[in-house]
């Protein structure tokens, strides 16, 4: 529980007034990444539910998307912008890493943030218009499960950085544990809270495979650029994985079936 509280305080702006001290093995809290996502998902769902009572679906979709940014303090959206500024500057590795540390927003950063947020709003709008707000609960959870792969048997090209707390530290047992409890939470909520049929559960679980495949391809692409992973890339991976999840859900559940 101590490590879960620590990682929740680290990755979100949820006001938790608990002093649980320092943990010399803080890296082990990475196993709770999906659980942090689950908390974010529940909060986003509740905010979405209230928003839909007060506003039209389009406004509610904007509020839901904004909620995800505010709950995390913009931590991951900042990583998205920094990553796109650096990786698509088409400079050498050292220059890319330097650009990634620069707090100023470039054109690539602004475009990436704008398009990702707009696409999220669009897909969330379609999803909630189909009376499927429950889908939002699993988006942050599955995205953070996927991004754990970016910390599995990886290296970082930087000597310092927040991402160094986790990159290369994930063990096989930690990954398996996270996968198992994620599957259980998705199954329990889908079947026993929302009483959805088995076919819907199978489709939602399929999003985990899709996100994993995306992250593997994303990691290969990043390695070609800077020979490793940084904290910004972890944040970028979360934002893009959430978008991939929404696209998958929209195409598989609402468009083709």
Curated annotation (Swiss-Prot):
Keywords: Cell membrane, Cobalamin biosynthesis, Magnesium, Membrane, Transferase, Transmembrane, Transmembrane helix. Its EC number is 2.7.8.26. Belongs to the CobS family. Its cofactor is Mg(2+). GO terms for cellular component: plasma membrane. Pathway: Cofactor biosynthesis; adenosylcobalamin biosynthesis; adenosylcobalamin from cob(II)yrinate a,c-diamide: step 7/7. InterPro entries: CobS (IPR003805). PANTHER family: ADENOSYLCOBINAMIDE-GDP RIBAZOLETRANSFERASE. GO terms for biological process: cobalamin biosynthetic process. It is found in: Cell membrane. GO terms for molecular function: adenosylcobinamide-GDP ribazoletransferase activity; cobalamin 5'-phosphate synthase activity. This is Adenosylcobinamide-GDP ribazoletransferase. It is an enzyme of class 2 (transferase). The lineage of its organism: Bacteria, Bacillati, Bacillota, Clostridia, Peptostreptococcales. Its main location: membrane. Pfam families: CobS (PF02654). The keyword Transferase applies. Joins adenosylcobinamide-GDP and alpha-ribazole to generate adenosylcobalamin (Ado-cobalamin). Also synthesizes adenosylcobalamin 5'-phosphate from adenosylcobinamide-GDP and alpha-ribazole 5'-phosphate.
């Amino acid at each position: 529980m101590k490590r879960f509280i620590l990682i929740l305080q680290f990755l979100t702006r949820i006001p938790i007034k608990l002093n649980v001290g320092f943990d010399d093995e803080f890296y082990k809290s990475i196993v709770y990444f999906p659980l942090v996502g689950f908390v974010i998902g529940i909060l986003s769902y509740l905010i979405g539910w209230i928003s839909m009572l007060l506003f039209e679906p389009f406004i509610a979709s904007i509020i839901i998307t904004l909620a995800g940014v505010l709950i995390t303090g913009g931590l991951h959206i900042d990583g998205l912008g920094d990553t796109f500024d650096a990786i698509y500057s088409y400079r050498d590795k050292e220059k890319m890493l330097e650009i990634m540390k620069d707090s100023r927003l470039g054109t690539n950063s602004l475009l990436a943030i704008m398009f990702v947020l707009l696409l999220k709003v669009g897909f969330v709008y379609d999803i909630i218009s189909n009376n499927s707000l429950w889908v939002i609960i699993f988006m942050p959870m599955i995205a953070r499960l996927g991004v754990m792969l970016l910390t599995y048997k990886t290296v970082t090209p930087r000597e310092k950085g927040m991402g160094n707390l986790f990159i290369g530290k994930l063990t096989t047992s930690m990954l398996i544990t996270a996968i198992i409890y994620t599957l259980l939470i998705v199954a329990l909520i889908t079947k026993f809270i929302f009483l959805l049929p088995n076919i819907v559960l199978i489709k939602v679980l399929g999003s985990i495979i899709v996100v994993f495949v995306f992250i593997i391809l994303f990691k290969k692409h990043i390695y070609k650029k800077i020979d490793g992973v940084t904290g910004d890339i972890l944040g970028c991976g979360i934002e893009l994985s959430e978008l991939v999840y929404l696209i998958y859900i929209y195409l598989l559940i609402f468009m083709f079936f």
